[in-house]
């Protein structure tokens, strides 16, 4: 893709990402959903533009969300997980299947625990008191991480098979 078109696509998707994160910051339930949808935009730029464009999108949305959003935790979720995950996924999937899967779990858990630690220390999140709730949260996170990784893969396939030709015809 030509640099001007890549810049245009990245800019529009950055604006949409910040808008989604803004809307997601109003309710505690919608923040993770907004982060996931915004991360799909990074995936789209990863597929279409390659190079430094996904990094620029990730950095610009992270910076703008920290500057503009009223709730800071959604910015932390995006910066530490949602925005960086499609880029990390691309590089980790160049490895063989089993090491790739294990490294994705390790990196995903490290990012999640770091985000949770920041939430506990700086954003006033509360930890449930019962040990079984903590264990259930970790198990649920593992399931969400695997499902999220699978959905990104399916989204890439869907984009390449069904929508990419239409998109390219639109931006000739």
Task: Go through the PLM ranges and name each one.
Residues 1-53:
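Hydrophobic transmembrane alpha-helices
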Residues 22-31, 62-91:
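Interfacial aromatic-anchored transmembrane helix boundaries in multi-pass membrane proteins
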Residues 120-133:
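Membrane-interface helix termini and inter-helical loops of multi-pass transporters
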Residues 134-172:
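Alpha-helical transmembrane segments and their cytosolic interface
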């Amino acid at each position: 893709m030509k640099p001007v078109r890549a810049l245009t696509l990245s800019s529009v998707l950055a604006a949409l990402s910040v808008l989604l994160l803004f809307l997601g910051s109003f309710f505690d339930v919608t923040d993770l959903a907004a982060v996931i949808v915004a991360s799909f935009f990074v995936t789209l730029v990863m597929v279409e533009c390659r190079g430094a464009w996904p990094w620029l999108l990730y950095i610009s949305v992270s910076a703008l969300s920290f500057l503009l959003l009223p709730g800071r935790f959604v910015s932390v979720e995006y910066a530490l997980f949602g925005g960086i995950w499609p880029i990390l996924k691309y590089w980790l999937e160049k490895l063989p299947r089993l090491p790739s899967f294990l490294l994705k779990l390790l990196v995903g858990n490290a990012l999640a625990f770091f985000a949770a630690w920041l939430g506990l220390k700086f954003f006033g999140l509360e930890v449930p008191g019962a040990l079984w709730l903590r264990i259930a949260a970790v198990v649920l996170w593992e399931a969400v991480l695997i499902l999220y990784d699978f959905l990104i893969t399916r989204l890439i396939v869907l984009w390449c098979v069904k929508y990419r030709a239409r998109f390219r015809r639109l931006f000739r």
